[in-house]
Design a protein with these regions (language model features):
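Short coil/turn segments at secondary-structure boundaries
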Residues: 129-130, 152-155, 290-298, 382-386, ...
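Acidic/polar, glycine-anchored loop/turn motif associated with catalytic or activation segments
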Residues: 213, 371, 484
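Extended, charged amphipathic alpha-helical segments
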Residues: 244-396
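Extended, helix-rich architectural segments
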Residues: 1-145, 152-165
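Extended, Lys/Arg-enriched charged tracts that mediate electrostatic binding to polyanionic substrates
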Residues: 131, 136-230
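Short, surface-exposed, low-complexity cationic segments
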Residues: 222-244
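Charged substrate- and nucleic-acid-binding regions of tRNA-handling and nucleotidyl-transfer enzymes
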Residues: 460-504
Length: 504
């Protein structure tokens, strides 16, 4: 009986417990297509910090040497920054206790003073670019390297420049862990983390943080580490992130973080590096193939008969070497109306110059569309290809414009606005601008510093439709004439009104 029960129980299969949810989907380990797919998501140091150098180098190469990579960087720069973002001071007159007219008069004076500094090359420590040129340089560096830096410097005033503030732009690869002393090394094999022996702070990819993880300093080298063409030794300087007495930033880091505890930015082209490189290789291969196929080549061949070829008979009689060419090509010419008599048994054949790779455009277009989708730049805008209908082209431009506006917000917040605030502090301190209560209350200071930043406008496909839309936005109170003038034409409304009155 026991044996029978044992056999009966053996026949009963115990149901295998199955997890629910993603266990049978994206997290399945039994699905054949996912068995070998086991990536790991780690922290900032392993996922980003350890790969930054490689990502920067490859991104820089694609931005310089591949047409699509160059287009992605330049198109974003052109539409986000363009010739430069202009400041429109907007003091919050309700908080400041002044009238709207007084606020407008103050804004006009501040803008004129700011342009005195910003439009001069004296604002650059190297005296090479004005602020608006530096915006483009900083933004391109941020896209290529993942982040870029600006250091506030000071120089004495001159009769033509009443401000001491100067800016020094620094490429992202110059901010790195110091390698001048073994005391900075922590044993990290990736080189991501180092240690400041003076205070025990950790240094992650050149960014020094305290025990709370707050940024306290940046380590900046005097040249790119590993620079082959140089007469200097590479040294590092510790630049405190904020002033000790004023808490004013000493360094601006322009980056777009996507993860908590991320201290360095990821290059803009990082998600599409492999695809861009493959498109470049495929394009080069097709170009080489097309060039080769464009050549018109002729081959002289000999006819083979039952008694052998012409060379066989000549070789048997000891007349000629069978390895010699069939004919002397210098005796024949190609040209219109030209007749050439060939020896018996000799024929002429040409190489087929047709291009059999008819799928190149379709395949490459699909790959570039994927690149554009990953970068939030529609294919039509990225490749400047507006062959679709008006509605489709406008939809592509509007979608791209949302991306550019978002990046402009980031850039203005990280770069332009902090520079404006530091400049305004000096302007108020030296008496060139009056702002009562500026240094007494942070809320009052913030109200004086409030400003909008406008840059290049969206391309207009149908001016009539866009103007009608602008008019309706103003009439319904969802926008202002000043904003519409700035966003549609990049001009100042008050200057337009004054010029129109003069022209009448």
């Amino acid at each position: 009986m026991a044996r029978k029960n044992k056999k009966f129980s053996a026949k009963i299969s115990t149901p295998r417990a199955k997890n629910s949810g993603y266990s049978e989907g994206g997290a399945s380990r039994d699905n054949k297509s996912l068995k070998g797919y086991n990536p790991r998501k780690l922290g900032y140091k392993a996922d980003i910090g350890a790969n930054l150098s490689t990502l920067r180098d490859r991104s820089a190469d694609l931005a310089i040497n591949t047409p699509v990579g160059t287009a992605a960087i330049n198109t974003s720069t052109t539409h986000t920054v363009g010739a430069g973002l202009n400041v429109f001071p907007k003091p919050k007159f309700q908080i400041l206790g002044i009238s709207a007219e007084e606020a407008r008069a103050w804004a006009r004076k501040v803008r004129a003073e700011f342009d005195l500094w910003a439009e001069s090359k004296d604002c650059d420590i190297y005296r090479k670019n004005n602020l608006y040129d530096m915006q483009s340089i900083a933004y391109q560096g941020y896209l290529t390297d993942g982040d870029s830096f600006a250091v506030f410097r000071r120089k004495p005033t001159t009769p033509d420049m009443p401000y001491t503030l100067r800016l020094q732009l620094i490429e992202g690869n110059r901010v790195s862990n110091p390698l001048t002393s073994s005391t900075y090394v922590t044993g990290d094999p990736t080189g991501v983390e180092a240690l400041n022996p003076d205070n025990g702070n950790r240094i992650l990819n050149g960014v020094e943080i305290d025990t709370d993880g707050a940024i306290v300093a940046y380590w900046v080298s005097n040249q790119v580490p590993g620079e082959p063409i140089t007469s200097m030794l590479t040294t590092w300087a510790r630049v405190e992130a904020y002033g000790k007495r004023t808490s004013i930033p000493n360094v601006l880091q322009i980056s777009n973080d996507t993860r908590p505890e991320q201290y360095r930015g990821v290059p803009y082209l990082a998600p599409v590096i492999e695809t861009l490189k493959q498109v470049y290789r495929y394009t080069n291969a097709e170009l080489t193939s097309a060039i080769i196929k464009s050549y018109f080549a002729l081959f002289f061949t000999e006819a083979v008969t039952n008694s052998g070829s012409l060379n066989d008979m000549l070789a048997d009689n000891g007349v000629d070497d069978p390895t010699e060419p069939v004919v002397d090509v210098s005796e024949y010419n190609l040209g219109p109306g030209t007749l050439n008599a060939l020896p018996k048994g000799v024929d002429v054949k040409s190489v087929d110059a047709s291009n059999a790779q008819s799928t190149f455009e379709v395949f490459s277009t699909q790959l570039i569309k994927q690149v554009g989708a990953a970068l939030n730049q529609p294919y039509e805008v990225l490749m400047k290809n507006f062959n679709s209908s008006y509605s489709a082209s406008r939809a592509a431009m509007l979608q791209a414009w949302e991306e550019y506006k978002l990046r402009r917000k980031w850039f203005a917040r990280d770069f332009c606005q902090p520079i404006y605030e530091v400049w305004l502090m000096e302007a108020v301190a030296n008496g060139r601008i009056e702002a009562p209560g500026f240094f007494d209350d942070p809320l009052i200071r913030k109200a004086w510093c409030n400003a909008d930043w406008f840059g290049p406008t969206m391309s207009i496909l149908d001016p009539v439709k866009d103007m009608n839309g602008s008019t309706l936005r103003v009439q319904n109170g969802v926008s202002t004439r000043e904003r519409e003038a700035a966003e549609m034409t990049g001009t100042d409304l008050e200057e337009n009104i004054a010029q129109l009155a003069f022209e009448k």
